[in-house]
């Protein structure tokens, strides 16, 4: 089933915040990660004859829930000493903005040289272009799972008691209510930051058009791990094409990539396919072989675009992901019970939040994020596993810390250009609420969320302008990508050619404005003028599920 990026337009009112610290802004933006049935990348191939089935949809009340105890990780090892913690737990908006818009001339990108099939020594790994060096060579296999839930408000996780599995991970791990104020709240730039450790301004991204050359310059975590040790099994399972494209980018892509297009005209059903495939991947993990899994869910974000983040539909989409997380964690715990000497570390994060009110629509979709309201810039990180304190809070964590953390867990020193730090190095800022239990954690995280605000006036206007301008080439790209998705080759190429011309006619001016508004790493003239790229790992459409016959109930 082909898909295209959903589009939306909206009006963002930043408002007036004390002495002109922010201004009212009116903007037009793109919706982010969800893809409609209009079409996806033209070369996405449906191969094979069978695929995982989505689970039967049940109400949260009817779904078997798991207690915190059932989801808890094995006994944690002693906490690592904080060696490079951030200086403060609460940075002013002005300081964050200054950091976000500063130049990055000292950053040295990596090159991601191919090492497929080559067993690397520690010295060889230290010499590779991604600047990651070996700190330890552990003989114990390492297993790490990162779960990405797009467009998710931490407040929505905390407020709904049906989100029992994510709340259990919070209760048995260390959690941050963090902010990315001063950085764009678009998915492609944000997930690139999460998966490379480099902020989008440095990487040169500001909209959702995938640019493969970005990851030749800034290697992904998959590139870094595969360069260090090709024996690490790297797996990516997602239902947004950009994630599959990022996983396949660079000279050393992830070992296994599965991309699920929209199924049954339902992102909840599609998220279920991602969840089941993730359970299968964990169950099939080979003992004695290190593994890194990245599981990505798009349904929450896409539902927020269609309705809003305060709607019952958004809450239901999040609860559906929560149920999938419960099944994934059950698989992790079962695997851990069978292999107690090889515990898993589980990290959960999001790329941005969403506004919980209706905004202007384009078609069926709304502008739900892309600007600088606290709803959009508030993010979260949950860290669960050995070395992370149970029931703790650490608001110095950020989603930019994910790649450095994974590097460190596998024995690598993160590249010198990384904007983040390993979460283990920030342990000095851990704290626990005075009162025990989840309610106290919930209140402490809610209080942290309430502290976050807008950037200063100049930054707010600059980022809004960047979002508006970046929407134009993205809109052109998406329209032509959707038009040509199911066309036959003779007609497809000339229409794509026209689309490429129009795209670059809007993209190059947008790149200039992006540079002027703080995107220091972009290329005004792209190295490849053809914007259409393949989507690796596209999965076949499962057989349609039968619609049950309604049964009359006597009352």
For the regions a protein language model found, what residue spans apply to each?
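Metal-dependent active-site segment of extracytoplasmic phospho-/sulfohydrolases and closely related
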Residues: 145-146, 165, 320-366, 406
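Polar, surface-exposed loop/tail segments
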Residues: 412-443
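Composition-driven, intrinsically disordered low-complexity tracts enriched in small residues
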Residues: 1-140, 432-555
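Short, structured active-site-proximal loop/turn typified by the sulfatase FGly-forming signature C/S-X-P-X-R
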Residues: 155-190, 198
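Substrate-binding rim/cap in mid-to-C-terminal beta-strand-loop elements of soluble/periplasmic
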Residues: 191-197, 367-410
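Catalytic-site neighborhoods of secreted/periplasmic enzymes
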Residues: 205-207, 213-267
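Histidine-centered active-site microenvironments of extracellular/periplasmic hydrolases
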Residues: 349-384, 436
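Active-site His/acidic residue clusters
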Residues: 244-256, 278-327
């Amino acid at each position: 089933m082909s898909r295209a990026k959903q589009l939306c337009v909206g009006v963002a009112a930043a408002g007036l915040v004390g002495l002109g610290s922010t201004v009212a802004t009116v903007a037009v933006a793109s919706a982010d990660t969800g893809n409609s049935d209009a079409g996806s990348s033209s070369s996405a191939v449906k191969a094979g004859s069978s695929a995982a089935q989505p689970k039967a949809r049940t109400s949260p009340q009817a779904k078997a829930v798991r207690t915190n105890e059932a989801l808890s990780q094995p006994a944690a090892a002693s906490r690592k000493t904080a060696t490079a913690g951030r200086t403060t737990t609460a940075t002013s908006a002005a300081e964050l903005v200054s950091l976000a818009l500063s130049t990055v001339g000292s950053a040295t990108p990596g090159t991601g040289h191919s090492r497929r099939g080559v067993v690397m020594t520690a010295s060889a790994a230290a010499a590779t272009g991604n600047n990651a060096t070996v700190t330890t060579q552990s003989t114990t296999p390492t297993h790490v799972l990162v779960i990405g839930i797009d467009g998710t408000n931490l407040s929505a996780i905390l407020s709904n008691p049906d989100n029992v599995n994510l709340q259990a991970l919070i209760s048995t791990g260390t959690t941050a209510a963090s902010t990315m104020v001063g950085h764009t709240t678009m998915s492609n730039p944000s997930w690139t930051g999460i998966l490379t450790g480099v902020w989008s301004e440095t990487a040169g991204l500001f909209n959702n058009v995938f640019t493969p050359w970005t990851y030749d310059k800034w290697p992904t975590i998959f590139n870094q791990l595969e360069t260090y040790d090709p024996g690490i099994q790297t797996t990516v399972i997602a239902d947004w094409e950009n994630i599959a494209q990022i996983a396949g980018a660079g000279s050393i892509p992830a070992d296994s990539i599965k991309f699920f297009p929209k199924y049954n005209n339902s992102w909840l059903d599609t998220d279920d396919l991602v969840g089941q495939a993730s359970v299968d991947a964990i169950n099939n993990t080979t003992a004695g072989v290190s593994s890194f899994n990245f599981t990505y869910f798009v349904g929450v974000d896409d539902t927020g675009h269609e309705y809003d983040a305060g709607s019952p539909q958004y809450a239901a989409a999040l609860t559906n992901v929560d149920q999938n997380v419960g099944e994934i964690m059950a698989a992790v715990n079962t695997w851990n019970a069978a292999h107690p000497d090889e515990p898993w570390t589980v990290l959960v994060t999001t790329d941005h939040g969403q506004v919980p009110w209706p905004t202007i629509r384009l078609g069926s979709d709304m502008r739900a994020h892309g600007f600088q309201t606290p709803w959009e810039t508030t993010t979260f990180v949950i860290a669960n596993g050995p070395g992370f304190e149970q029931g703790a809070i650490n608001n110095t964590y950020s989603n930019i810390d994910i790649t450095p953390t994974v590097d460190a867990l596998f024995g690598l020193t993160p590249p010198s250009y990384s904007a983040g730090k390993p979460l283990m190095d920030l342990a000095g800022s851990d704290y626990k609420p005075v009162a025990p239990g989840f309610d106290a954690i919930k209140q402490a995280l809610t209080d942290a969320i309430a502290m976050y605000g807008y950037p200063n006036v100049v930054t707010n206007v600059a980022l809004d302008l960047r979002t508006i301008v970046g929407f134009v080439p993205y809109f052109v790209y998406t329209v032509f990508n959707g038009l040509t998705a199911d066309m036959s080759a003779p007609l497809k190429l000339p229409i794509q050619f026209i689309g490429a011309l129009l795209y670059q006619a809007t993209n190059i001016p947008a790149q200039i404005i992006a540079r002027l508004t703080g995107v220091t790493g972009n290329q005004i003239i792209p190295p490849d003028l053809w914007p259409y790229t393949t989507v690796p790992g596209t999965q076949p459409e499962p057989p349609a599920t039968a619609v049950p016959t309604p049964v009359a109930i006597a009352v």
